[in-house]
Amino acid sequence: MAIDSYCIPNFSQTIDNRTIVNIFQSCKYRSQLSVCFLNDKSAADKFSNSMRQGSGTITFIIHAEDGEISEQLHSTFRSVSTMLLCGMQLFVFIVAPRNVISSETGKAITWAFRGSFIELRDHGRGEQALHDILEQFYRLSPLVNVPKMGMAYYGPTSFAELLSLSSKNKTSWRYVIDYSMFTRSALVGFASHMMDECSFANKQINVIGYNPPYVWAGLRHGVTTRFTEMSTPDPEGYGPIKLILPRLTGNVLLKKVKYVQHDPQKKLLCDDSVMFALSRNILYIGVYPATHLLDYNLKGWRMVAVDPKINAAWAETLKQRTSIDLVPISAKFEFNAQSTRDIVLKYFSGVPFSIIDDSWVEGTEDYEKFQELKQSYFEQLVMNGSTSKLRVSMISMKWNRTKDVKCRRLLALLPQPYGGSLRELRAYFHVNGAAEVNIKKSEVNSYMDKFTSLSISEQIGSQKFMHMLITNYGDALKLKTGRDKAIIASYSLSNAINKKERVLKFLSDAAKSETLIIFGAPNLNRVKFMIKSGIVLGSDVTISNDLITFKNASGKVWKDYGYTQSELIKSSMIEITIEQMLCISSSSYNGVGYFANSIYNDMFSWYVPEWLFEKYFSIQDIRLSPVALVKCFTTSIRNLCYVPHLTYYALRGSFVEKVLITNNVLNSSYLITGTSHSTFKVLSNFEVPSPAGVLKFKAGDDVNISGHLLSLVIAAHFVASPTLLWATHMKRMTTPVNLPKNLDKLLFFDNKIKNGMLEKWHSREEVVLAAMIVENYVAHILNGRHSIEIIQEITQVIYEKFNA
């Protein structure tokens, strides 16, 4: 049948605001991809077929029969990249041994496409356990990809709970929490990875703006956390910092940050997280079993563990799982001069250290006497802590007293976030604690009655009191910057209390001093486009100049300044996506994944300093490639509008021809081809003026303009799109580049490699010419529902980067 026999629709017939809104909404579930590595081809065949038939899952199988899988990776993941917004589960089986593709490389590739990494190569062919796991994947489809890009998960802990949330209309807010918690975890993982790459002497992160999971995420990545807050409400307790029995219904907890719970079985998690964040030298009394520490990366910490229940096997497990420098002592700590001499001074003489106490004895009367002994010992230890040999920083003591108690050097007496039913408190002794304070049993009883009456969520929120011990108060824009300094400023510095000029100067100074700083803020132009398209209601988000006012369903209102890419570029900051940061650190990431994104999160963009980019990210591999981001948007729109492949590429050729005609290029100098491999052929030499300088075309050239750039501009209307990062890579790849020797060659499967060189992608002319048609191109594809600001900002970056 001839092409003329078909009725071919065009974009203007089908693209309206509803189409734009649908694309934004499909972004919530973008990349429903799982990639499973296994050794059993027959199992892959069987379950691939079952998942296709049972749930409509789109499946692929890569089989490394000859030990080479680069071409299969290229063809498979190029196909996957077009389907990431299709709303269907994608499942790739890769049957290859680890000597062909390592787990580390497999994870990096999977996460580059925002997928779930599944490693099953520890199971042999035909093994029943393997079939049981794959059978479960088949039964749970399409929920197999929970979570994406992470090992643990913050959100609902079971599929049943996830589904029940949907019926209660709670999923929308949960998605915002889900992805924002993933974001914080990913930022910590990336910062930790780069601190190692940069050989930081001090692995401490300054986090601007309080949010509880940063502490937990930090310890999973071997870093300590310090928060910086402008101020905090009065805790309304006793003592020098008002944290002795702080008020449970006061402003501190009323203004607590919403977040998803940790494992409620791990009651010591919050207290120990704070203590390990305070010091890298820990004396842990009554440590056994310490299962809550096993997921931490404690490399760089030293812990003297004292407990009669510990043995060599326990110690070996803890060392292997956490990489901690462990001194196990299988004995009782006697809380006397001998313990001080034999343990404290022996291992901590002249070294700052902290003590965690979780020891106890059976029997109410005996336990009370035991606590008296401990309290007296700890008070004396703290008061002697100013000596050169004994430098105790903080002591956390298990507290469950049965009578009135007089304390010295008590800094805080706090409820345990997960210990409400135990009616147990934590006492913190410090040299700056109260000189003397009376703790009445009746007051403690009343306090614990109030605490146990709180909801579980409210009890868990009380960990904010503990986190006040690792919070500094003051102007975040006066933080010290420079080498060996790491700062995370996401969802915080953009707050309206921080004037934009000061923030941009702070970022500029930080970047110039080679501070490892990560900045996240609303993308002003994308938020404007969201409002214009009706994806966010005017009652929920409003803009006045560059000030954005947000209002959530509960009525809470907050204001942030929106930032543009061009503003951040002037401050030497380069945009990079959260997922790209995570791919870079995938080999060491030990944080959480996510199930779904949210429209709110897609309002934000993140930036890192230019010096970091130039030093570590100057050559693009799949981890930084836009291939997993850009093509799916254009493909989705094409499919919504039934625009044929032939028509789409002919359209690009038509726009290019208009540019050539406008610039008085003779039509005898070129031949428009308009295919996916060629835009036009040059028949005789000609030049075209452009904002980036003169473009020169030579007879015989086969010109293929950059489709990635065109697709990137479409994507930038919907999600964070790192234009400068990609443009810098693109300019570098206008000539062949040596294949980096320190990276797995498979990370470059989307490149053409010849004689150890990465072949060039596009010429300067092909990129700039694409930029010259991009406004008309996007206006046509989005049927006039595009953002001039987004387009102009991107093209300006291209012109400046490629200026001759």
From Swiss-Prot:
Compartments where found: Virion; Host cytoplasm
GO CC terms in record: host cell cytoplasm; virion component
Pathway assignment: mRNA processing; mRNA capping
Principal location listed in the UniProt entry: virion
Entry keyword Plastid: no
Source species, domain of life: Viruses
EC number assigned by the record: 2.7.7.50
GO molecular function: GTP binding; mRNA guanylyltransferase activity; RNA binding
UniProt keyword annotations, A-Z: GTP-binding, Host cytoplasm, mRNA capping, mRNA processing, Nucleotide-binding, Nucleotidyltransferase, RNA-binding, Transferase, Virion
Listed CDD domains: capping_2-OMTase_Phytoreovirus
UniProt keyword annotation of Hydrolase present: no
GO biological process per UniProt: 7-methylguanosine mRNA capping
Family: Belongs to the phytoreovirus protein P5 family.
Function summary: Enzyme involved in mRNA capping (Potential). Binds to GTP and might have guanylyltransferase activity. Together with the RNA-directed RNA polymerase P1 and protein P7, forms an transcriptional complex positioned near the channels situated at each of the five-fold vertices of the core.
Protein name according to UniProt: Putative mRNA-capping enzyme P5
UniProt source species: Wound tumor virus (WTV)
Organism taxonomic ancestry: Viruses, Riboviria, Orthornavirae, Duplornaviricota, Resentoviricetes
